[in-house]
């Protein structure tokens, strides 16, 4: 485990000691090396658990998320270069340090063995993200967005702390591996209902559940590109990961407590997908689409069958790469046209033909085109919800159609048609951007050849 944590910590002195012209090259190459070493974790069997120490362990649920976390840092650094080109050197170094700190916290969160340790790190990821949003965001609205982000997440996760202390007093341990053997079945009582809510709400706000999702589009729209990427790709997956881990100790309460939340999520994914159809703001559209994809994951986790768990883990990884790529594309438009409104950025295919290819690929993966892992995840979730209740096929079918509509709408609005006249001096697409997009799309295509490595512990 230390072979990921120590190089990540050493990235910070590397950044601060680099000269101005070498800072991006050094940090990006070093973080790419870390992400390549993390691929060694891939050859892990489904039922295997690597116990690194008393603090850290990884199994086949946390491994794909861990690799995704490490894969995203070099991509975030590549994407942020233009955004920070006007800043002075100290600010650049501070920004990179924030990203590295965030990655460090996330690596430790996904491998934490104690629930309290997991909780502390889960909250610690809030601080660098908040600094990134409120310091390097684009508009003055970013302070408001940061407040929303902070208070939704904090108010959601404080009851979890109380619940964890209660479990510690009852059981005597919060170790993931011990809890499997020690935990008692929860009986149906008011105190246990509140306990269930306290444990689940923290992660449902983070996912976010429809109704508690208001912070997400705000935070996405105001965050700089690296903030948006890490928020969509990894911080939302923290919620799903936490839910998958904590449902272990909440049985058999989840069987009947899950009904309102499953209904809310099924309804919410249709609603947020429909909201996407009438968005004018590009980043807001991608933000709402990630709410609707995460609603599927909530449904899958609450149904609690092996198939739905596999679908949830596959969908989390697929959505992480897809939404991150879409945010990069939206940002490359924003850097050229200085506007996120889709009406002002029409007909870019004639100006940037290679970018149009990336837009097409990203839109197709977002609408779950076969044979991508997005489709594999969605099909697993769809089949498990259908076997849970037949009537959900209507909602699920709508949820297959509406993302196709808004993805194609986004593609046609930005790429097709006649370009607007205020686009006069537009820079061509850089090699950096093309490399960034290909590093997003290649893992998606390669994983669709062998999806079993991301199907989680039950495969």
From Swiss-Prot:
It comes from the Eukaryota. GO terms for cellular component: mitochondrial inner membrane. One of its GO terms (molecular function) is ubiquinone binding. It is a multi-pass membrane protein. The chain crosses the membrane at residues 20-42, 60-80, 98-118, 147-167, 193-213, 224-244, 256-276, 285-307, 312-334, 351-371, 393-413, 435-455. InterPro entries: NADH4_N (IPR000260), NADH_Q_OxRdtase_chainM/4 (IPR010227), NADH_UbQ_OxRdtase (IPR003918), ND/Mrp_TM (IPR001750). One of its GO terms (biological process) is mitochondrial respiratory chain complex I assembly. It is an enzyme of class 7 (translocase). It catalyses: a ubiquinone + NADH + 5 H(+)(in) = a ubiquinol + NAD(+) + 4 H(+)(out). Keywords: Electron transport, Membrane, Mitochondrion, Mitochondrion inner membrane, NAD, Respiratory chain, Translocase, Transmembrane, Transmembrane helix, Transport, Ubiquinone. It is found in: Mitochondrion inner membrane. Its EC number is 7.1.1.2. Core subunit of the mitochondrial membrane respiratory chain NADH dehydrogenase (Complex I) which catalyzes electron transfer from NADH through the respiratory chain, using ubiquinone as an electron acceptor. Essential for the catalytic activity and assembly of complex I. Belongs to the complex I subunit 4 family. Core subunit of respiratory chain NADH dehydrogenase (Complex I) which is composed of 45 different subunits. This is NADH-ubiquinone oxidoreductase chain 4. It comes from Bos mutus grunniens. The gene is MT-ND4.
């Amino acid at each position: 485990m230390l072979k990921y944590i120590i190089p990540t910590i050493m990235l910070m002195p590397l950044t601060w000691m680099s000269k101005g012209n070498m800072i991006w090259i050094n940090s990006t190459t070093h973080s790419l090396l870390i992400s390549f070493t993390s691929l060694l974790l891939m050859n892990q069997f489904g039922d295997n658990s690597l116990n690194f120490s008393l603090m850290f362990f990884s199994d086949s649920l946390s491994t794909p998320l861990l690799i995704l976390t490490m894969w995203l840092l070099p991509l975030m650094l590549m994407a942020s270069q233009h955004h920070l080109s006007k800043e002075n050197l100290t600010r650049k170094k501070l920004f990179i340090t924030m990203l590295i700190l965030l990655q460090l916290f996330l690596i430790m969160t996904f491998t934490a063995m104690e629930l309290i340790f997991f909780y502390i790190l889960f909250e610690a990821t809030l601080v660098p993200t908040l600094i990134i949003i409120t310091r390097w965001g684009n508009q003055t609205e970013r302070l408001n967005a940061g407040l929303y982000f902070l208070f939704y997440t904090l108010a959601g996760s404080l009851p979890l702390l109380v619940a964890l202390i209660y479990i510690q007093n009852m059981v005597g341990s919060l170790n993931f591996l011990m809890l499997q053997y020690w935990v008692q079945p929860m009986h149906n009582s008011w105190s246990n209902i509140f306990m269930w809510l306290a444990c689940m709400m923290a992660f449902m706000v983070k996912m976010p559940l429809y109704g508690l999702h208001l912070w997400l589009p705000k935070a996405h729209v105001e965050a700089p590109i690296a903030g948006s990427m890490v928020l969509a790709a990894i911080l939302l997956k923290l919620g799903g990961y936490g839910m998958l881990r904590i449902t272990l100790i909440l049985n058999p309460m989840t069987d009947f407590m899950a009904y309102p939340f499953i209904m809310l999520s099924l309804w919410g994914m249709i609603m947020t997908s429909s909201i996407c159809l009438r968005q004018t703001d590009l980043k807001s559209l991608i933000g709402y689409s990630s709410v609707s994809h995460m609603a599927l994951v909530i449904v899958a986790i609450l149904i609690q069958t092996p198939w739905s768990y596999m679908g949830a883990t596959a969908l989390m990884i697929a959505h992480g790469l897809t939404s991150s790529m879409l945010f990069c594309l939206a940002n490359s438009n924003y850097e050229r046209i200085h506007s996120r409104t889709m009406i002002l950025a029409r007909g870019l295919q004639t100006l940037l033909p290679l970018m149009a290819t990336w837009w097409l690929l990203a839109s197709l993966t977002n609408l779950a085109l076969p044979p991508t892992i997005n489709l594999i995840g969605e099909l697993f979730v769809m089949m498990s919800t259908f076997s849970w209740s037949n009537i959900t096929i209507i909602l699920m079918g709508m949820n297959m159609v509406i993302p196709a509509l808004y993805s194609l709408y986004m593609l046609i609005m930005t790429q097709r048609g006649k370009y607007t006249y205020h686009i006069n001096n537009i820079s061509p697409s850089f090699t950096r951007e093309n490399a960034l997009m290909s590093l997003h799309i290649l893992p998606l295509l390669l994983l669709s050849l062998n999806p079993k490595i991301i199907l989680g512990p039950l495969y």
